[in-house]
Each structure stands twice: as structure tokens, then as C-alpha cells.
């Protein structure tokens, strides 16, 4: 193509070219117009644009932009009024929400995504049961995600997980089911909710009361309901015990623990009866402490404390004698109800009282605990510095310490820090962590039978990187016998912030009195290395030695990046040795 020009209009053309050479600044446009334009960008591009300069950072961070994006993502959402940045928070919650799962059995080993309810305002927590999955959003709506038979793209009928949804109830605060890892025991779903109660005689208007509603997980039918006095407000519910003696533990807004006992085998009978709500012993023995969260399993319960509930001088003398000086925040207390679990967790039965299962036992830790994970006979704790401590049964290597020795006190896993989430299963553990480039990875240890540690069918005594693609905004996880679930959500107001370890603790060894995080015995480490060398020497060929070395690297307590380096280096050496000739298969002297 040839561009022609007229000599008579050469001056005009030159001036037009000069005008085109002057750039027009975007700052000359009204801010409202720029905000309206950038609001049509995808969220990922909008965030990238906001990182280019100070001007676009202010434009892309405006609440008006995020309000338009939020209404585009969730047209049915109401006006937001809570929090410092309500529209930005709501938009990011709905943009990042997702439930992903990977089945352990079958030929397809890929990550799948469940159906996304349009009515859901972000995902706060989830719970898989025997047949379905339940999800709670940030406005208290509980969704019932059903498994169903659907037609595939090839016209075949196949069974899909969490492919249809219905609203189970609204006004929910929390929910729980049987705490065992096997979902076959989760027959009922207990929902803690707020309901408007009609006015009684002599009063005007209705009152909001907390209640516990029990639903059948198979059909979503409500079979039982118990209502509490309007003066009591709860925020968390957990279950403990067997079906015939199911204990419901309820945490109040003030940090008190109440409990009641129901018989699940009689819940489906249409009758009315009264249950007794009593103050749990941990709140009676430690009345000045405020419990912030609970975790439970079949035969144990764990409490993490917050700030003091009442001034120390107002604590009764009897309570002061029972608890002379407990920690005000981040302390951990245990209830263990069976001798077998007690022995697995603490290595002894010395302090176990079979007549008093509710007596709280304090765990000694060097720092405040932020969150925890509780399995059947082992547990994991994460402190304010991002350190991971494991305790309990280690028969399958589920503590990640590099060996299979039980731990009767919290022991630090030195090569893992600052996790996003922690999960303790029946005989394996999972850690969700973030790499330096902000991508997520899933690490696991323990028993690998049944595919529960993807890529490691033989299991591992130390945390290894699992062969699974983790969503970018994954925040929590759950593992069952059949499936691995990961919840994707990002809340800009609830990001965990770890403290930097003081300089006095960085290079030095922990105090002898702490016990938790004490370094392993050097003699034991040397003995293990000698055993590894003897195993390598017993291999008949060089290729077998390479494979054995890869296996040993997986056993050793190394960081994930270090293990990846050694595995890649061994693969390179193995490929190079494979083409060197027939003499490479002869073992060296």
C-alpha cells in the first residue's frame, strides 16, 4: 500500500502529524470517566493496572469501581455497609470463590470444580458428608451441593460430585457433623442459626434467638430443632462423642463453652423432649479466660484462648488455685476422653482420669497459637511466628518429623513455616503453603494408601510436595477417604499476619524447658544416615541406587525446594548414566 500526499496540503499534513505526536494524558479525563472505563476490565487485569503507577492505583482502588464489578459478578447482592472497604471486599470474595476437589480413585487424576451458587456471597467454610457437600457463605446462607447423575459431552450418563445446589437454610452462623474423618458416619448436619421467635404473652414484638437445627445430610430434611434463651448468643458449634452420647459444644460470643448431650438414634422420632444445657468444665475451672475457637474429634477437644474475660482480681479464690497463671491469649487446652487416644497424644497415662474426662489439660508452647488441626490421635499447631508444631501418634510418619517415633509433646517441624492451612487426617497430614512467587502448593506426609497423598503411594515420613495443582486463592482444605477438597476464597480483612521471630530466637536453639521444637538428637541423625548408606550399598545396580536415593530424599526432613532440587539432579544423573553404556549397571566397589 502506497500512501499519497498532495504538495499543496503538505503544510497541513505536517501540522497534523505534529499534533498527533503530542500524547494526551489520561489525567486530563474526569476521574469519574476513567473509573467507569476501568470497571469493565477483568479483576485480574484491574489489579495489574493498579500496580503500574500511583495514579492508576488510586483509580483502580476506588470503591465506585469495585461496586460496579461486584454488581456485575453478583447482580443479586445487596448494598454493602460493613467493613472499611465493603465493595472491594465483596467483589474479591465473589471473584475468588470456588470449591475444588480431586477423587483419589479412578483413572482421572485431575482437579474438578463444583457448581458455584449464584446466590452465594463468597465461601466462608465447607463440610463434605457421605453423599453431598455443604457450603456456608458470608451472609449466613447454607448451601446444599448435591451429587447427581448427569449427561456428559459424549452423551454418557456419569456420576458427578457437587453439580447441583439448593439453599438449605438462611441465618446460619456455623454448622458441624460427626468429627470422624470417614464421611460415612456423617448422617446428620447440626446448624447453629438465628431465628425470629414470635412474641410471648405480655410482650410486644418478636425476638431473635439462637437455635440448633438438625438436618438429614442425605435429603436436607430438618428432623430436630432446639431453641435457646434470647440472652445467649453463640458463634461456633462442634461435636464430640459417639452417636448415642453425642455432645454438642457451643461457644458463646463472650468466650464461654456450654454443652448438651443428644442421642442421634432418636432424632428421627417425632417427639418433643428437653435437653440440659450446662457450662463446660473448661469455663468453670478457668472463668477468667475467653475461648476464641474450638476443634474436636471423636474422643478429644481442643480449645484456643483469647484475651482475659474478667479482671484477674475478680477471679474467685478457688479458681485461682486451680489455674494460677494461665496465658491470656493463644493458650491451648485439651480434653481427652479415652485412654487410648490419651496415650497416643501424650505417650503416657500418668495424668489421665477416667472419672473426669472434661478436665482441661494445658499444652506448653513457646508462643501464642493462632490455629490448629486435630486428628484422631495426632494434632498440629501453628503459632504467631508461623512455626508448625506436631504431636501424637507417628506410626505412619504423619507428624512429618522425618521418622516414625511418637511425640508426647509439641515438636517443631523446622523445614515448614507460615502455612495457610493445616489438616490432620486419620493417619496423614496436609499443609497448604505459599511460595515466594505467591503460588500455592500442597505438602503431605504419613500414609499414602488409597491415593490420599497424590504422587506418593508409599507415603512419606516428612512433608513432600504432592502432585496436585492448587488454586491460586486456596485458603482451606479437607481430605476424606474418597476425595481431597480445597476451598478457594480471599478475604482482604482476614489475611493471617505472622510476626517475625525475635533475633534472639532466630539462630539459637530453643530453651530446654520448652521441649517443643528441640532439635533432633545428632546421634540419631547420624545413625539414620548410616542406615541410608547401607540401603544404597545393598542395591545391585546404579539405577536401583538412584531410585533408592530418591526415596531417601523423600524421607529426609528437607524443605520442599531442597527436595525438588535433589530429585531433579538425580533425574539428570540417571538419564546421563542410562546412555553411558552397559558397564553402568555394575555396582561399584
Swiss-Prot record:
<comment type="subunit">
    <text>Directly interacts with SKP1 and CUL1.</text>
</comment>
<protein>
    <recommendedName>
        <fullName>F-box only protein 24</fullName>
    </recommendedName>
</protein>
<dbReference type="InterPro" id="IPR000408">
    <property type="entry name" value="Reg_chr_condens"/>
</dbReference>
<feature type="repeat" description="RCC1">
    <location>
        <begin position="386"/>
        <end position="435"/>
    </location>
</feature>
<dbReference type="GO" id="GO:0000398">
    <property type="term" value="P:mRNA splicing, via spliceosome"/>
</dbReference>
<dbReference type="InterPro" id="IPR052866">
    <property type="entry name" value="F-box_protein_24"/>
</dbReference>
<keyword id="KW-0833">Ubl conjugation pathway</keyword>
<feature type="domain" description="F-box">
    <location>
        <begin position="23"/>
        <end position="69"/>
    </location>
</feature>
<dbReference type="GO" id="GO:0035082">
    <property type="term" value="P:axoneme assembly"/>
</dbReference>
<dbReference type="GO" id="GO:0030163">
    <property type="term" value="P:protein catabolic process"/>
</dbReference>
<dbReference type="GO" id="GO:0044782">
    <property type="term" value="P:cilium organization"/>
</dbReference>
<dbReference type="InterPro" id="IPR001810">
    <property type="entry name" value="F-box_dom"/>
</dbReference>
<dbReference type="GO" id="GO:0034587">
    <property type="term" value="P:piRNA processing"/>
</dbReference>
<dbReference type="Pfam" id="PF12937">
    <property type="entry name" value="F-box-like"/>
</dbReference>
<dbReference type="GO" id="GO:0007338">
    <property type="term" value="P:single fertilization"/>
</dbReference>
<dbReference type="GO" id="GO:0006325">
    <property type="term" value="P:chromatin organization"/>
</dbReference>
<dbReference type="GO" id="GO:0007005">
    <property type="term" value="P:mitochondrion organization"/>
</dbReference>
<dbReference type="InterPro" id="IPR009091">
    <property type="entry name" value="RCC1/BLIP-II"/>
</dbReference>
<dbReference type="GO" id="GO:0007283">
    <property type="term" value="P:spermatogenesis"/>
</dbReference>
<feature type="region of interest" description="Disordered">
    <location>
        <begin position="506"/>
        <end position="526"/>
    </location>
</feature>
<dbReference type="Pfam" id="PF00415">
    <property type="entry name" value="RCC1"/>
</dbReference>
<comment type="function">
    <text>Substrate-recognition component of the SCF (SKP1-CUL1-F-box protein)-type E3 ubiquitin ligase complex.</text>
</comment>
<dbReference type="GO" id="GO:0019005">
    <property type="term" value="C:SCF ubiquitin ligase complex"/>
</dbReference>
<dbReference type="InterPro" id="IPR036047">
    <property type="entry name" value="F-box-like_dom_sf"/>
</dbReference>
